[in-house]
Regions:
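Short, small/polar-rich loop/turn modules that mediate ligand/substrate recognition or access, typified
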Residues: 179, 184, 239-241
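Substrate-binding pocket helix/loop in short-chain dehydrogenase/reductase
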Residues: 101-102, 106-114, 209
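Conserved glycine-rich cofactor-binding loop
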Residues: 16-17
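Active-site helix of classical SDR
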Residues: 125, 163, 171
Length: 253
């Protein structure tokens, strides 16, 4: 299947490991131009060079960005514009998953979770649609949400669930606003995915999938990445405001 991603510039936030890295790799595999981002310069450089070498494409870029800082939004758009031109697809994947039950939760932890998981994606989406509308160009946004946005959390992640629920409502509202400009906004809702972010939790509860995931196992990053790449592609031109459940049956909505 031709996804129509050849030569498309795709910003993937949080893409040095886990799901984000898997998405960036699939974009490169489709001859798109992934923009790798992460907080650690060494990791960003290593992944960028790995993808450049594997897919023989020197256009693949990587930038060290801390998306807990609001200033990161203007920075990433400016450097991409300088090096590659405009962004064709925005994939908001960067996020944090701190653990704290509400009774013990610190306000600063709640605020940081909302900032990284909701406020910065809002600002990135805003900047993206402003530029696309001004240039009269079509575009695609894929926001990575979570099954917790729909079911809440039972494992000490109420702030995470709240941030992702907010991103769901925001994404649907944005889709209603910008579809007339040829901009599609969709979501992928993973369940538990085997990534560095979830590694400790899975070690602590090795039987997590027993009885919770009908398919009987946690997801590998590549499985969820396929959903994100589909929604980023021309194959999803008729889809907007939808949530692609990639939960192994946890949602079944």
């Amino acid at each position: 299947m031709d996804y129509g991603l050849k030569d498309k510039v795709v910003l993937v936030t949080g893409s040095t490991k886990g799901l984000g890295k898997a998405i960036a790799e699939l974009i490169a595999q489709e001859e798109g131009i992934p923009v790798v981002t992460g907080r650690r310069e060494k990791e960003v450089h290593e992944i960028m060079m790995e993808l450049r070498e594997k897919y023989q494409d020197e256009r693949i870029q990587g930038y060290c960005v801390d998306f807990s800082e609001l200033s990161s939004v203007d920075f990433i758009f400016d450097v991409i514009k300088k090096d590659l031109g405009s962004i064709d697809v925005l994939i908001n994947n960067a996020g944090i998953w701190p653990t704290a039950y509400v009774v013990d939760m610190k306000p600063e932890d709640f605020e940081r979770t909302i900032r990284v998981n909701l406020e910065v994606p809002y600002l990135l989406c805003q900047k993206f649609v402003q530029e696309k509308i001004a240039a009269q160009q079509k575009g695609k946004i894929v926001n990575i949400v979570s099954q917790a946005a729909f079911h809440g959390s039972t494992t000490g992640h109420a702030h995470y669930a709240a941030s992702k629920a907010g991103l769901v409502s925001f994404s649907i509202s944005l889709a209603r606003e910008v579809t007339k400009y040829g901009i599609n906004v969709n979501m992928v809702a993973p369940g538990m995915v085997r990534t560095p972010m979830t590694e400790e939790a899975l070690k602590a509860k090795p039987d997590y999938d027993n009885g919770r995931i009908p398919i009987g196992r946690v997801a590998e990053p590549e499985e969820v990445a396929q959903a994100a790449v589909f929604l980023a592609s021309k194959c999803a031109d008729y889809y907007t405001g939808i949530t692609f459940d990639a939960t192994g049956g946890m949602l079944m909505r």
